[in-house]
A protein has these predicted regions:
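Acidic, glycine-enriched catalytic cores built around paired aspartates
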Residues: 1-186
Length: 186
């Protein structure tokens, strides 16, 4: 199915896309992500040890792709999570697009299973709609969600909070949105 990019394997593609994913705060997917991240750290430590001893190089591992997730996705075939050949990988520490079936708190709950103490960087690019956290109550809720995330070991969050209609209008009338900042990375 993967080699065929799921062509002719609609049933397998549906099973892959409906399986529990990292980002939904499910036990199985969280355990797999934690295991893989720990294995990644172990491999990096083991492989970099000779260079550290010989040259004094200190490896600073990260869960980071910046915008390379798009180019990397273009170079790889389909994957067992239901991502088709050529589609982007997830960006930085963010779970794969479409996998956060339990919303923001489910995504953050999954991320807290990663061993962030072993990583120098692992930015989460978080896109939220302004209406989700409107008003004083909404702002306080968002503050509490982020505070809880960081208090429990979360590493780094870059928040983008723009209304889709505002972005569309900015494309049509850029002169009316000179102070609008759209951050892609960094």
């Amino acid at each position: 199915a993967l080699e065929a990019n799921f062509v002719g394997y609609d049933d397998v593609l549906a099973m892959c896309r409906n399986a529990e994913k990292f980002g939904s705060d499910g036990d199985l997917s969280n355990r797999h992500a934690e295991r893989l991240a720990n294995e990644y750290l172990k491999i990096l430590r083991d492989e970099s040890k000779p260079y550290a001893e010989k040259y004094g190089i200190i490896l600073m591992p990260s869960i980071q792709s910046d915008t390379h997730n798009i180019k990397m996705g273009e170079c790889f075939g389909a994957s067992a999570d239901g991502r088709l050949s050529g589609q982007p990988f997830s960006q930085n520490s963010r779970p794969q697009f479409g996998s956060c079936s339990k919303g923001l708190t489910g995504m953050l709950g999954s991320l807290l299973h990663l061993p962030f103490r072993g990583f120098a960087s692992g930015s989460l690019n978080l896109d939220v709609q302004p209406a989700m956290f409107a008003g004083e109550k909404g702002e306080k809720l968002f503050e509490n969600i982020l505070k809880t995330y960081f208090d429990n070991g979360g590493l780094h969050v870059q928040v983008s909070c723009q209304d889709v209609n505002e972005l569309i209008d900015a494309q049509i009338h850029p002169e009316n949105h000179r102070d609008l900042t759209v951050r892609v990375t960094g």
